């Protein structure tokens, strides 16, 4: 007995068991009587649509998705060439029902014929905003069956999957970045800029300074090229090409510079860092009709002030600390990254920052780090991943422990710091545990001296 007969016979048997005639069932289900007759009684049954099957299921009191497995086999296994007009509504309906198992079966059968890859890709693009998890399943099949290794749909599929994998675990993000990175330069320009920024954030959170610099350079070069093309088009009185960027172009341009500044700060190459501070300090020349262009120009000017003060503290100029604290009072969103820099400078030069640590204890020890960072990530000015904040907290607790150790303080504060450091690393970045060996050695020396 074929699968088609099984689907027809299952429907026919259930209709008869519930006492319906064709006329009464047509009235109850809303399916045309002629369609029912052609489907159930004809020697060459007429294929039904997924919408008609849903109506029959509802009339029979069956759960949503009843007989879908048999419908799939009829639709895809028995027809010589599947009809996309039947298959597309079927996939959409399976998405609505969250039936990834059925979608998996549909795609397996459908993509034996590679001519359907483009239809599957376009459907995934339509679904990505509302049903990301199931759209990703479609992209995975595009990747599996696409034969052209340089096709745009293949590269975009890799990018969509990469974006979906980025989360709060730094090690998981690294795996996603390593898989996607080879495709980044094949993306359309708008996606390429966003992809480069995401990759840069991942590498920065991993403290992979060389790769962060590479991504920052690519962001700067590409955003500069786009800007030049826009200006040339304006000069030639041509229509400026529209780019559907996630953020204004100045964000990418400025972030390419800011990332290099931040890396050189970390590598203690302070003269180089200052060069890039000067470059993003004044971007008033950057023309863009985007409504938020001026807002971000002002943000980069503000960041130049912050990083200038960072460099002063990191080069031993303690007199700038009071002004820094005044600015933090007005801009509490900068407390986390700034406190980390101030702690590093304090540990390097012996500054006393007890007042700062006491003032911002609620930010240093939030009830839930992730909730605090996610809330901050929704701010208008924020374009960094949450993982950068997580890594800052790990570094913050590490520097805090050193700060208290250097002052021979072993009390409940240090216990709290060590516990929070350990739990944060365990949850978000277990690879950092080796970095703490020096700290633990220092703690053993401290506790040993106190016991004596």
PLM region spans:
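"A position-specific structural signal for the A-helix of alpha-solenoid helical repeats
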Residues: 85, 89, 118-126, 153-162, ...
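Helix-turn-helix repeat elements of alpha-solenoid scaffolds
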Residues: 92-103, 127-140, 165-179, 209-238, ...
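Alpha-helical linker/edge segments of TPR/alpha-solenoid repeat scaffolds
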Residues: 163-174, 204-211, 240-262, 301-319, ...
């Amino acid at each position: 007995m074929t699968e088609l007969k099984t689907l027809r016979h299952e429907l026919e048997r259930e209709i008869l068991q519930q006492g319906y005639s064709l006329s009464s069932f047509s009235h109850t289900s809303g399916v045309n009587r002629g369609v029912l007759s052609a489907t159930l009684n004809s020697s060459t049954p007429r294929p039904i649509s997924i919408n008609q099957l849903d109506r029959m299921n509802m009339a029979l009191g069956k759960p949503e998705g009843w007989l879908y497995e048999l419908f799939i086999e009829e639709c895809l296994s028995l027809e010589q060439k599947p009809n996309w007009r039947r298959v597309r509504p079927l996939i959409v309906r399976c998405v609505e029902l969250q039936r990834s198992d059925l979608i998996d079966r549909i795609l397996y059968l459908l993509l034996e014929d590679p001519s359907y890859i483009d239809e599957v890709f376009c459907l995934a693009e339509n679904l990505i905003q509302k049903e990301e998890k199931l759209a990703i399943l479609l992209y995975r099949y595009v990747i599996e069956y696409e034969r052209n290794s340089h096709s745009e749909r293949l590269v975009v599929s890799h990018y969509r999957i990469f974006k979906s994998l980025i989360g709060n675990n730094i090690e998981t993000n690294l795996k996603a970045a390593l898989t996607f990175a080879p495709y980044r330069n094949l993306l359309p320009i708008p996606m390429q800029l966003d992809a480069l920024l995401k990759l840069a954030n991942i590498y920065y959170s991993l403290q992979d300074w060389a790769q962060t610099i590479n991504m920052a350079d690519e962001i700067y070069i590409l955003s500069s090229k786009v800007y030049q093309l826009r200006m040339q088009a304006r000069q030639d009185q041509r229509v400026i090409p529209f780019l559907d960027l996630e953020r204004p172009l100045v964000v990418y341009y400025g972030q390419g510079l800011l990332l290099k500044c931040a890396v050189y700060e970390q590598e203690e190459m302070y003269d180089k860092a200052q060069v890039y501070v000067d470059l993003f300090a004044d971007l008033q020349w950057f023309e863009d009709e985007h409504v938020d262009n001026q807002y971000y120009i002002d943000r980069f000017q503000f960041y130049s002030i912050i990083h200038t003060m960072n460099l002063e503290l990191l080069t031993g100029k303690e007199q700038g600390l009071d002004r820094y604290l005044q600015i933090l009072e007005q801009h509490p969103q900068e407390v986390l990254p700034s406190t980390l820099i101030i702690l590093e400078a304090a540990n390097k030069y012996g500054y006393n920052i007890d007042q700062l640590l006491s003032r911002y204890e609620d930010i240093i020890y939030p009830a839930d780090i992730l909730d605090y960072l996610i809330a901050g990530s929704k701010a208008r000015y924020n374009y960094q991943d949450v993982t950068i904040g997580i890594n800052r907290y790990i570094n913050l607790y590490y520097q805090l422990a050193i700060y208290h150790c250097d002052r021979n303080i072993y009390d409940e504060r240090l216990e709290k710091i060590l516990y929070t450091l350990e739990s944060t690393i365990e949850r978000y970045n277990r690879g950092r545990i080796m970095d703490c060996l020096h700290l633990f050695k220092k703690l053993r020396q401290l506790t040993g001296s106190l016991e004596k």
